[in-house]
Amino acid sequence: MKILLPVDGSEYSALAAEFIASRTSLLGRKPEIEVLNAQFLNGSVVTGALLSEVWGEKTLEELYRVRAEKAFAAVRTPLQVKGIPFREMTVRKAPAEAVLEETAAWKPDLIVMGTQGKTNAEKLFLGSVSTAVLAGTSVPVLLVRDAPAPKKDDLKVGIAVDGSPYGEIAVRYLERYRELLGANPEIRVLNVVEDAMNAMITASSDCDMAVVTEEEARKLEEKTFEENTRPVVESLRDKGFANVTPVKLVGSAGDRISSYANREGLDLVVMGSRGYTNFRAAILGSVTTRVAAETAAPVLIIR
């Protein structure tokens, strides 16, 4: 497995490295890890050019070197303690551009990024490196926030499904790289269904139609839940994942998934993402974005 680890010297980069180092089963497969640091002063080419003119190229080179060393130092310890080989690479580009270009060139199987957590999804993602990377690549991205790395190899994982093909895409990825989850992970297949009774009451108030009974509404919820989860549960079990449980949640998908993950202490949340051609729609309209913003555990986004 090839893993790209972009770093910026923050505590979140260190947490991302610690998550990788916690994957004992993965380390046994000897993954290739590249640690990438992008140097881009104040996000401006002009700033770098002006400083080069004022300070001189030699001084600017030293600044780049010191900043890169600081970024690498933050992740070396957790990787080296586990004896994990990795290589370091520094480029002079905007961070998102650097990650996307290296992804296209090196073709990693996974990008692991530390990201600062906020409760407001728009504040978290608009203008952030994480957003640009998610919008610009189809390679799976693992976003690590401020939760400590799992202490055990076997993870408690939530896979969010909605009846779309992305649930099966996520299953295929996890089957191929199952060492990410440990030898015997506990998997919860999460499906959020609409509150059928409330939906029917709302619909009946807009037109002349009979209101269904609560029992009929609940049967509709169960039917939807069964249709959305059964194929994924069966596929996981067929692929050798023994501990798989379907979980029904009712309400708003983003809120219910994140609150369940936090309440149950999940070690990892896995989600498929359709991707969008409209960038703002991807940021503000995505359940995936909401979950990534509000869930303490790392979130693996597979497209």
Language-model segments: which ranges?
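Hydrophobic alpha-helical membrane-association signature
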Residues: 16, 71, 170, 225-228, ...
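Small/aliphatic-rich secondary-structure junction motif
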Residues: 1-55, 84, 155-211, 235-239
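General small-molecule cofactor/ligand-binding pocket signal
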Residues: 34-36, 87-91, 142, 188-190, ...
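Active-site-adjacent beta-strand anchor residues
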Residues: 6, 89, 114, 160, ...
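A short acidic, glycine-rich active-site loop
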Residues: 55-67, 211-224
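N-terminal membrane-insertion helices
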Residues: 68-72, 76, 222-229, 233
